[in-house]
C-alpha cells in the first residue's frame, strides 16, 4: 500500500469530525472497530481501504474524546493536581498543563489557563506547582465576529480555565526557554517598543500592554503576534539559503545537497521551540519533517503526493 493511499485514508477518516453534531458512543466505536477488522481480511483492495479509513475514523473519535475528557470530568469538584507552568505574564495570568491528578500521572496532559490571582512567589515557565484547583470548561459562546472561543481553546490544547485555591512550588527552576526570554527582555528594556519586539519575534503576547493590543486588534495587525507556520517555514527557507550560500566556500568533496535541507528543518524546529512550540508551529515542523523525509528518500514525488502526506 502506497504512503499516499494511507494519507488519503487518514484524511477521509478524520474529516467527519468537522461535521458530526456529537461524538459516537463507546459501543458504536467498538462495533466499527470490529467491522473494520473483519473487512481487513477480505482480499480486495477497495475493501481494505475502507477498513483502514474506518480505523482512522475510530482513532480520530477516540482522540477527540480524550481532548474533551478534561472539560467533562474535572469541572465542578476541587482537584488536587500538579501543574507545570508553560507561560505566564508574571502577574495573574498563567498557562499550564496538569501533569498529575490526585497523585496519578495524566498523559497527554490537559492544558489550562489560570486567571485572577498572584502565585505565592515569583513564577516563570518551567516551574512545577502543587495546586488545589477549581476549573471549568471554556465556554463556546460566539461573539459578534463569529469567533468560537471553545473551538480555539481546544485547538490550542487548553480546554480548561479556572483558579487555584492553594499553591506551593515543587520545582522552582525556570526552563531554558524562560531563562533566554528573561535575558532577551532585559536586553530590550531600553527600547520603547520592547514588548512589541518580543511579541513579534518570540510570540510572547502576555507582556504586551492592553492599549497596544487594542490598537493592533483595531488595525487588523494582531495576528502578527502569533508565530504561525509562515514564520517557521520562512526560518527554514532562510537557514537553508544561508547554508547553501556558505557551501560556495567549501571544498567540492564537502558539498552535499542534503545539508541545506537538513539544516533548514533543524533551524525551523529550533525556532519553533524558541517561540513556545504552539500547535500551528508544531504542525509546520511536522509537515517540514515529512517533506524532508520524502525528499531524502530519493524518489520523485509530485506536489500532490507531498501535499497529501503533509496534510495527513
Predicted regions and their residues:
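Hydrophobic alpha-helical transmembrane segments in multi-pass membrane proteins
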Residues: 5, 47-50, 162, 214-312
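Generic recognition of cysteine residues
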Residues: 9-12, 37, 124, 174, ...
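N-terminal leader/targeting segments
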Residues: 1-74, 161-163, 283, 300
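Short, electropositive, low-hydrophobicity segments enriched in small/polar residues
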Residues: 17, 203, 207, 233, ...
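Helix N-cap and loop-to-helix transition residues
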Residues: 21-25, 190, 209, 256, ...
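Membrane-interface helix/helix-cap signal primarily in integral membrane proteins
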Residues: 54-223
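Alpha-helix capping and helix-coil boundary motifs
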Residues: 42-46, 148, 175, 190, ...
